[in-house]
């Protein structure tokens, strides 16, 4: 007993002694942090900060004895320059002029790099996935039915295009039938074929193949011809997003994170965030001619640095490394629009353009036929900010002799000013495919044209032109043109122009005032004076085009002549979804012509045949799966409503361009739903695409479920429709919400505690969505997989 008491007293004595060593004022404080980081090797996950720019991801950092080391690949990914070698981990001593600092409180690694050594940033438009151009399978028949009645002469004509399209290209043929109904036959009655061809586009290579009737490619200093044969060419229209000419780039360097603003000709066009280091700004707007850009960089402290960069841009150049070409081989076509099948000499024609660099584009052209060969070379060169120079020369060998053709031109454009000069000359014996076999062809021996225009601010703009041509028989024509236009009030415009043949009798002068009246149309008035007879004409015209979504339009015009007879015209038009019609009258008091026209198309697509307006290129057929009177939108503009079969055709779609097509479901009743309301689409040239926007009727109901004791089915229970597999959670008061219900449904309900029951639903025949059917009672627990449920009211 005494020993136990002694042990307790010893422990108490020791505890009191220890308590006396502790300062009560410091009893609740933590021990102080170590004054220095331990010398042991640590691997830390730190947020890297390069010249003040924090990276999103963390990287592993080794730290020992005050030195940090970073993996080579992490530095490279951040754009930090590293020396060559095989070392995986690099310390500060391995990185010249680069500092590494461990920020322990904020768990960061501060990396300081000379701005010029950082990886260059290329700031451009975000790369977007190129949309796949679509094409459905189908066919169409365009028509233009026209009839005219003048005095005792009447005739009718029908122009047509029959076209088929699909994944393998487009096939088309055009022609015209004409018949004299009364009066003397002019010899134009009968059928005349124009063009027949098959065309295929390769979107990956931007190449196009065409078989049949074609027009050969040409340069500014050569001429195209009609042929029947094969054509292989580059087609840049397949890529509307592609800029084929060189655009300027703007370089700079930022020491810290900030923003860069680009001002072009005084207008801010871009504002982008940048990281420290050198940068190249490539996201510039589409510009043309001479101009001035100002690049303004701003750091986090608001300091600004502005750099002015002059530039000159022309679309006549090709971007460096880009090629454009056209090769046509076949038989020359003669008497086009006069004979259906008239092909002659076999021939070949080709052009090729290549962007050697951003200032020079080379051009070549060649032609070959029986007894004719031609070759030419040229180039387009940008002269710094001074404009664009073009030069070309070509020579031909022909049975009747050899000849040369030369051309030279200059163009300068800037905001509010433009000037251009072009001169060409050709020998009398120079020949090409366009004149082959045409004995009476007369071509110009030389041609000179000069044009200039400038803006006058509030006074409008003025332009002038001089044209001088000399034919092979030494006939010379010189013409001077002057024009001035100015915007007046509320988008009205005044145009004044004058023309004079230097070897003629005087000036031909005209003035026109155009007054837009908004949705009510356009009113214009003009006066003309002719030097030949010294007479004048006054013209008054009113034009109200039919709305694009359909409707009525008309045009009225009256010409009063000081010498001669007055001229009158009137036209009435109707634009519908299925056809466009026009009727009109024109002429003077003694010679009047009545005419009428109907244009449209018949389209076979998607297992259906429908009527439409004339379709000149691509189109989209919208289908709502039989739901009528639903508004259809193209590029966010309502263009019509679906017909009784749920169709609306959009006949003026721009090919290869991604456009937004959609439907407006705001007017649908609550029991109607659409799977989607808009979708972007790109359609191949000459093709059509069927876009389905399924709109269907749904039976919507909120069903009330009760347990055997009259309490609602527990919150969080899961209800499943056995037929469709649709699931829905049970909410408060035993309510469960389902869409697309039929009159009879089999329902399985599983409570949170795992019990299940079957519910046989018999919904009311009426479709009143405001009612809540039920309650339906579940007997829990259910035996096996089936319980007993009865409707209690």
Each predicted region: which residue ranges?
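Post-signal-peptide, soluble extracytosolic/periplasmic N-terminal scaffold domains
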Residues: 2-6, 14, 27-246, 531-603
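Short, ordered, surface-exposed loop/turn motifs in non-cytosolic proteins
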Residues: 39-46, 54-59, 626-636, 709-723
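A short, amphipathic beta-strand motif
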Residues: 46-48, 252, 620-624, 699-708
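Short Pro-Gly-centered beta-turn/loop motif in secreted/extracellular proteins
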Residues: 62-70, 284-290, 647-661, 665-669, ...
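Extracellular beta-sheet/turn segments enriched in Thr/Pro/Gly and aliphatic residues
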Residues: 108-113, 315-318, 608, 677-697, ...
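Feature captures outer-membrane beta-barrel proteins of Gram-negative bacteria and organelles
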Residues: 131-132, 156-168, 188-204, 344-358, ...
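Transmembrane beta-strands of outer-membrane beta-barrel pores
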Residues: 145-151, 168, 177-181, 213-217, ...
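Short, acidic Ser/Thr/Gly-rich low-complexity loop/linker segments typical of extracellular
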Residues: 637-646, 724-735
């Amino acid at each position: 007993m005494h020993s136990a008491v002694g042990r307790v007293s010893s422990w108490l004595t020791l505890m009191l002694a220890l308590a006396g060593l502790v300062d009560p004022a410091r009893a609740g404080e933590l021990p102080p942090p170590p004054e220095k980081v331990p010398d042991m090797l640590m691997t830390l996950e730190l947020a890297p900060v390069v010249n003040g720019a924090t990276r999103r991801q963390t990287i592993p950092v080794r730290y020992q004895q005050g030195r940090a080391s970073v993996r080579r690949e992490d530095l490279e990914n951040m754009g930090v320059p590293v020396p060559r070698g095989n070392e995986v981990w690099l310390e500060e001593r391995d990185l010249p002029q680069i500092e590494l600092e461990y920020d322990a409180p904020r768990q960061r690694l501060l990396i300081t790099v000379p701005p010029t050594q950082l990886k260059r940033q290329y700031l451009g438009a975000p790369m977007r996935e190129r949309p796949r151009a679509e094409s459905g399978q189908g066919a169409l028949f365009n028509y233009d039915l026209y009839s005219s009645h003048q005095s005792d002469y009447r005739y009718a004509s029908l122009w047509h295009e029959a076209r088929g399209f699909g994944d393998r290209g487009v096939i088309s043929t055009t022609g015209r039938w004409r018949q004299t109904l009364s009066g003397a036959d002019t010899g134009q009655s009968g059928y005349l074929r124009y063009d027949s061809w098959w065309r295929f586009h390769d979107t990956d290579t931007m190449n196009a193949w065409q078989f049949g009737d074609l027009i050969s490619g040409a340069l500014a200093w050569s001429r195209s011809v009609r042929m029947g044969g094969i054509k292989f060419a580059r087609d840049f229209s397949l890529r509307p997003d592609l800029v084929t000419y060189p655009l300027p780039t703007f370089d700079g360097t930022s020491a810290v994170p900030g923003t860069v603003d680009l001002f072009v000709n005084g207008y801010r066009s871009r504002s982008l965030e940048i990281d420290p280091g050198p940068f190249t700004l490539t996201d510039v707007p589409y510009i043309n001619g001479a101009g001035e850009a100002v690049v303004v960089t701003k750091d986090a402290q608001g300091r600004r640095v502005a750099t002015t960069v002059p530039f000159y841009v022309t679309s006549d150049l090709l971007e460096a490394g880009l090629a454009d070409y056209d090769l046509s081989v076949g038989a020359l076509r003669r008497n086009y629009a006069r004979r259906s099948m008239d092909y002659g000499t076999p021939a070949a024609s080709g052009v090729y353009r290549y962007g050697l660099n951003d200032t020079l584009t080379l051009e070549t052209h060649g032609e070959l036929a029986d007894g004719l060969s031609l070759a030419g070379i040229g180039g387009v060169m940008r002269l710094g900010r001074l404009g664009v120079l073009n030069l070309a020369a070509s020579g031909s060998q022909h049975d009747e002799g050899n000849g040369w053709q030369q051309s030279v031109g200059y163009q300068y454009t800037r905001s509010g000013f433009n000037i251009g000069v072009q001169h060409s000359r050709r020998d009398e014996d120079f020949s090409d495919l366009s004149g082959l076999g045409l004995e009476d062809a007369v071509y110009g021996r030389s041609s000179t044209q000069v044009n200039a225009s400038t803006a006058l601010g509030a006074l409008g703009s003025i332009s002038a032109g001089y044209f001088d041509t000399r034919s092979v028989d030494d006939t010379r024509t010189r013409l001077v043109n002057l024009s001035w236009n100015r915007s007046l009030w509320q988008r009205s415009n005044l145009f004044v122009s004058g023309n004079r043949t230097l070897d003629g009798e005087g000036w031909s002068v005209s003035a026109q005032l155009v007054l837009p009246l908004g949705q009510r149309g356009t009113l214009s008035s003009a006066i003309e004076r002719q030097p030949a007879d010294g007479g004048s004409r006054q013209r008054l015209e009113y034009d109200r085009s039919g709305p694009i979504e359909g409707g009525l339009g008309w045009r009225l015009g009256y010409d009063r002549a000081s010498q001669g007879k007055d001229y009158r015209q009137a036209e009435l038009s109707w634009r519908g979804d299925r056809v466009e019609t026009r009727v009109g009258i024109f002429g003077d008091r003694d010679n009047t012509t009545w005419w009428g026209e109907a244009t449209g198309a018949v389209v076979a697509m998607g297992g259906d045949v429908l009527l439409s307006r004339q379709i000149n290129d691509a189109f989209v057929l919208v289908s709502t799966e039989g739901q009528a009177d639903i508004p259809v939108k193209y590029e966010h503009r309502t263009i019509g409503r679906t017909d009784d079969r749920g169709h609306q055709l959009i006949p003026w779609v721009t090919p290869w361009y991604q456009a937004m097509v959609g439907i407006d479901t705001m007017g649908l009743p609550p029991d109607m739903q659409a799977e989607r309301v808009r979708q972007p689409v790109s359609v191949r040239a000459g093709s059509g695409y069927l876009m389905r926007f399924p709109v269907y009727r749904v039976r919507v109901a909120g069903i009330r479920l009760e347990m055997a004791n009259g309490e609602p089915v527990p919150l969080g229970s899961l209800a499943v429709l056995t037929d469709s597999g649709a699931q829905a959670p049970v909410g408060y008061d035993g309510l469960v919400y389902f869409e697309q219900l039929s009159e009879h449904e089999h329902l399985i309900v599983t409570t949170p505690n795992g019990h299940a029951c079957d519910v046989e639903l018999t919904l009311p025949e009426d479709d009143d969505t405001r009612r809540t059917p039920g309650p339906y009672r579940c007997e829990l627990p259910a035996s096996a997989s089936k319980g007993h449920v009865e409707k209690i009211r």
